[in-house]
């Protein structure tokens, strides 16, 4: 995993908001410093209201970078996310970023990348695909949700869909779909898996990757109040890299991307 060092605390301006369905919105804002330094897997912490409510900033994966503009995907779950999703062009926001580490697209050597995501977990995958394509990697998306309303494929290519209710694509979950696909994919050359989504999905994927001997990195989600290691709101328990015992980690500092083998299943 690659770590980010060029962090800025910036005032930015929203240039557009667009509903993508399923209570998810695409928000674009201008912030040259963050756009210049963003890597796949990084996130930003955003405060939209200049008052003290909501008190904590909200973390969002960086979805895409276009020139000086940064795009995020946000799901309206009330509070700060509602303010952001309903904001109009010209709204001023406060943004810290880029934060966290990034997906490692260099090692171990691989020719095909499988990007597994669930629901809003597709958020970081567009920027990741762009960087992988620049390195001439084959990219396959495996995307899951409860129904077609949970599926978001904006900017993504070569997508394989799984829905639990069968309203789109394969009927079942992403692990079942991946299990059906993986044999043929592995025949084409070395594979590395990258993932973001609900914790149960990530834990199941960690087990599957271990079973198949696949290198796998996952982006974890938790509460991140400050994003810079001060509030200690994002502590997670992971296996030690040695494989023996566990230890606590500040996800905003040493994550959100971790090796899947460290997840406690």
Task: State where each predicted segment sits.
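Ferredoxin-reductase
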Residues: 2-89
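Local cysteine-cluster metal-coordination motifs and their immediate loop/turn environment
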Residues: 199-200, 221-256
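FNR/FR-type flavoprotein reductase catalytic core
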Residues: 79-223
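Structural signal for conserved beta-strand scaffold positions within catalytic alpha/beta enzyme cores
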Residues: 16, 64, 161-163, 218, ...
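A charged, well-structured terminal subsegment
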Residues: 174, 255-265
């Amino acid at each position: 995993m690659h770590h980010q060092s060029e962090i800025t605390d910036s005032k930015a301006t929203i240039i557009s908001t667009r509903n993508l369905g399923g209570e998810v919105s695409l928000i674009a804002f201008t912030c040259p410093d963050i756009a210049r330094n963003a890597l796949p897997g990084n996130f930003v912490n955003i405060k939209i209201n200049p008052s003290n409510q909501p008190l904590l900033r909200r973390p969002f994966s960086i979805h895409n970078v276009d020139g000086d503009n940064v795009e995020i995907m946000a799901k309206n779950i009330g509070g700060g996310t509602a303010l952001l999703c309903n904001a109009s062009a010209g709204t001023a926001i406060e943004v810290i970023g880029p934060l966290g580490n990034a997906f490692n697209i260099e090692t171990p050597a691989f020719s095909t990348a499988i990007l597994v995501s669930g629901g809003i977990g597709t958020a970081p995958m567009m920027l990741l695909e762009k960087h992988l394509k620049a390195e001439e990697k084959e990219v396959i998306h495996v995307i899951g949700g409860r129904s077609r309303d949970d599926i978001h494929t904006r900017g993504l290519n070569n997508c394989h869909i799984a829905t639990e209710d069968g309203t789109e694509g394969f009927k079942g979950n992403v692990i079942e779909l991946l299990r059906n696909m993986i044999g043929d994919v592995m025949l084409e050359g070395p594979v590395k898996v990258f993932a973001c989504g609900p914790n149960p999905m990530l834990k199941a994927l960690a087990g599957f990757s271990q079973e198949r001997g696949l290198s796998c990195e996952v982006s974890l989600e938790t509460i991140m109040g400050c994003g810079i290691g001060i509030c200690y709101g994002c502590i997670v328990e992971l296996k030690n890299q040695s494989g023996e015992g566990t230890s606590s980690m500040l996800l905003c500092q040493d994550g959100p991307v971790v090796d899947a083998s460290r997840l406690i299943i």
